[in-house]
Amino acid sequence: KKLFANGFTMRYDAMNAVTGPYALRIFEEILGAPKGSVVNSKPLPDFGGLHPDPNLVYAKELVDTMYGDNAPDFGAANDGDGDRNMILGQKFFVTPSDSLAIITDNYQLIPAYKNGIYGVAKSAATSTAVCRVAEAHKLPCYAVPTGWKYFVNLMDSKRITFCGEESFGTGSSHIREKDGIWAVLFWLNIIAATGKSVEEITMEHWKKYGRSYYMRFDFEGISGEVADKLREAGAEYGA
C-alpha cells in the first residue's frame, strides 16, 4: 500500500480472462493502485477477441504501453486461467527464467518465506539462471522434464518451494500450482522492499550472478505440413 501511496504506477492486463475481478480487488481496491491500473478486466467468453497469452506477441497492448512515453513503473499480465505471468518495467522485459531466479534470490524479503525455503526447480528448457542463485544460497536446484506434475512431486516431498518454466509459468508450494497473481505480488514486494525499479533489480542481479542467454522459437499460424517438416528436422538434429 505504501508503494502506491507514494505515487508508484502499474499497468496490469487481465486480457479479458479469469483474473480480472481478482486483480481489481487486489491491486486497485486493497493495495491502492490508481483507478484504471487494471485493464481488460472483464472476463469474456471469447476474451474480447484477444489471445490471452502473456508474452511479447499477444500482450502487445501492454508491451506498447510499457515501451511508450510516460510508461507506468511496472507492467504485468496473466493468461486465460491466471497461472502464467509476464513482468515488465519501463522499456524493459524480464524473461521468465530471470524472473524465477530473481524471485528465488529475494525470497527473504517476503514474510511467508523469511524463515527459509526448501529449494527450487526449473524445467529442462528454462535457463540456468536460477541454478546459480540456488548455489549461492546453498539450496537444492532440480531440472525436470516439461510438465507441471514433476514440480508437484518435488513439492509434495518438501524438496522445493519455488518452481518455474520458460513458458511464463511460476509457482510455489502454497498451492502446488502456477499462480500468476502470486508472481506479480512477489515482484511488487521486491520493488517495495528495495525501492528499485524492475530494470535496476534485474541489472543488479545480472551483475551479481551473470546473465544467461537462450533462445526460444515460436512458430505461429503454420500449416500442418510445415509443422511436420519442422518436427522431422528437429528429430534429425536431436532436438
Task: Please provide the spans of the model-predicted regions.
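Phosphate-binding chemistry for phosphorylated carbohydrates and sugar-nucleotides
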Residues: K1-K208
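Catalytic-core signal marking the mid-to-C-terminal active-site face
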Residues: K196-A239
